[in-house]
């Protein structure tokens, strides 16, 4: 059943998107390997090697989704971002992600606002070395925010989440699903005694002042009742006030759907980061005296 739902989700995303033509330019030492694949053997140096994506079709004040597949050896931290001029100053917004050993899908979102001459790019932070490959790069204008914007929230073919910080690096895993009503995989969060566990969306997700964010997901505990929480986190660099919306809930031994809604404030003078049009989704297990584990599945994020 989940496989059918996955296909339906991708079909809905395709129907709600407007393809945008892009020109891809790999800068050395990135190499074009053919068939839309680009590779690099990154040495960890302070060179920020990049792939540039340009388009004459990117419009202001629109949301765009960059989809691609990636794989990597090592622990290199790759960035994907959008840069351009805004109000006479250079403005750059980026997302950091890390690929695994096998090709997996990624979906990243950007809000162009009033950005002039925008350029999308990949580059790599100095640090861990590794071999990295990306392929099937595609840029779409997101025409309908009412569809699910987390196509890999079912964890069957990819994972739209990563540990919230290095502290939680070992608390997240994708495992065989424990009797979920569809599909074969679920996300597992595992916490030690007197500790918590938390993941966040890899992508910044669209958030429109005056509109309502709807988050849906299923959860079950491995044993007993575990306190869980979710944040809609609007905190962005360069802004003084940090808006976030917390939700608390209990995770029981049986699968239960959790549905949460939040009307995004329109006061962009107080909460200036809302002008960026983006937020992150965070899901976690609360810090308690007991160790525990919980499973998450069917995560959806949309705007109405």
Model-identified regions with their sequence ranges:
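Short helix-onset patch at the extreme N-terminus, typifying the N->h transition
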Residues: 6-9, 24-26
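Positively charged n-region of N-terminal signal peptides that target proteins for export
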Residues: 1-5
């Amino acid at each position: 059943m989940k496989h059918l739902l996955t296909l339906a989700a991708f079909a809905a995303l395709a129907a709600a998107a407007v393809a945008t033509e892009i020109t891809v330019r790999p800068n050395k030492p990135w190499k074009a390997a053919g068939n839309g694949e680009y590779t690099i053997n990154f040495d960890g140096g302070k060179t920020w090697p990049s792939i540039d994506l340009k388009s004459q079709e990117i419009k202001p004040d629109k949301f765009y989704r960059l989809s691609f597949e990636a794989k990597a050896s090592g622990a290199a931290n790759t960035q994907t971002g959008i840069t351009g001029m805004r109000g006479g100053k250079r403005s750059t917004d980026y997302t950091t992600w890390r690929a695994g050993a096998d090709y997996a899908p990624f979906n990243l979102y950007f809000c162009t606002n009033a950005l002039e001459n925008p350029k999308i790019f990949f580059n790599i932070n100095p640090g861990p070395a590794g071999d990295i490959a990306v392929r099937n790069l595609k840029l779409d204008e997101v025409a309908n925010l009412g569809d699910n914007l987390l196509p890999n929230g079912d964890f069957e073919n990819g994972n739209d989440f990563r540990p919230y910080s290095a502290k939680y690096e070992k608390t997240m895993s994708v495992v065989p699903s424990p009797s979920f009503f569809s599909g074969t995989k679920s996300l597992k969060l595992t916490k030690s005694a007197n500790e918590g566990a938390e993941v966040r969306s890899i992508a910044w997700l669209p958030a429109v002042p005056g509109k309502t964010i709807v988050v849906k997901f299923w959860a079950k505990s491995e044993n007993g009742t575990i306190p869980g929480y979710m944040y809609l986190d609007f905190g962005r660099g360069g802004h003084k006030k940090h808006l976030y919306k917390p939700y608390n809930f209990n995770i029981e031994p049986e699968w239960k759907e959790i549905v949460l809604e939040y009307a995004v404030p329109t006061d962009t003078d107080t909460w200036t980061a809302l002008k960026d049009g983006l937020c992150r989704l965070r899901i976690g297990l609360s810090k308690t005296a007991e160790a525990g584990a919980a499973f998450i599945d069917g995560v959806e994020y949309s705007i109405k």
